[in-house]
Each structure stands twice: as C-alpha cells, then as structure tokens.
C-alpha cells in the first residue's frame, strides 16, 4: 500500500510492502521508501549487496504487507517537495524489471511519455509481474 498526500511543499507517504516512491530532483533520483522484504533485511545488515539483492531468488518475499496479519503498522515518511521535483510511485513489477539508474534515464529523457516508456521497457525485459507506475510532476 502506498498512499501519498501532498500539502504545500510537503509530501506525506504511508508505506507497507515493496512498492516504492522515488523523488527525482535535478540530477539524481532517491528512493523515499524502504521495502518490507526479506532481501531488504539482508541488504540492511550487510549480508548481501544491493546488486545481489536485485537477482536474489527471494526478493519478492515480504516481511510486512496488507492482508497478512490483522493489524499492520505502515512506515510514514515526510519529505520536502520543491518546484520541478518529480515523484515516481511504482510497483515491484517495474523495479524488478528495470534497474533504478535506467528508470531515472527513461524519465529524464522523455518526461511526457515516461509512463508508457517505463511499462514498455519492463514488459520488453520480461514483464513477470503486474506493472503500476504513477508520476507526479
């Protein structure tokens, strides 16, 4: 789950699972959420690298998700949103098929057609899961 509220120059994110929110600002893209997955815990404690996580066979094993238990506490993030920032919300169907640096390049090359281009690239790369992409400019 990934509800977002934007009020003035603030963005409020509620997060559970492995869908992600990124902020693209000028020349970089930063992930604003942290996956609730087994593989993310391995990355966090230094057992595997981010590169190894991308190919890990258990990368879709969630540690926290809606519907798994009766009550789930979401992570809540508050971030600054400034003029010309781009917010990307996406499911793991995108991030499992396209590396972050390539996602950034696709968006920067053609903002107006970025959603179509991202979904096409993810499908061309195998499209193994549902692909959800929302871009806020």
Question: For each predicted feature, which ranges?
Answer:
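Short acidic-glycine loop/turn motifs at beta-strand connectors
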Residues: 6-10, 24-28, 137
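Amphipathic coiled-coil signal-relay and dimerization helices
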Residues: 13-15, 23, 33
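A secondary-structure boundary/capping signal
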Residues: 15-17, 35, 90, 99
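An anion-binding catalytic pocket shared by soluble metabolic enzymes
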Residues: 20
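Conserved, helical-rich catalytic subdomain that frames metal- and/or nucleotide-binding sites
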Residues: 34-83
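C-terminal catalytic subdomain
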Residues: 64-137
């Amino acid at each position: 789950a990934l509800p977002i509220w934007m009020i003035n120059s603030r963005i409020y994110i509620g997060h559970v699972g492995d869908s992600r929110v990124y902020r693209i600002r000028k020349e970089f893209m930063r992930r604003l959420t942290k996956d609730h997955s087994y593989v993310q815990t391995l990355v966090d404690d230094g057992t595997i690298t981010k590169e190894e996580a991308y190919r890990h066979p258990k990368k879709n094993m969630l540690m926290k998700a809606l519907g798994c238990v009766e009550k789930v506490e979401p992570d809540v993030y508050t971030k600054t949103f400034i003029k010309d920032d781009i917010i990307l919300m996406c499911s793991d169907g995108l991030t499992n098929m396209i590396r972050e640096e390539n996602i950034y390049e696709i968006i920067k090359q053609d903002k107006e057609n970025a959603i179509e281009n991202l979904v096409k690239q993810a499908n061309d790369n195998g499209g193994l899961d549902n692909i959800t992409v929302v871009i806020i400019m």
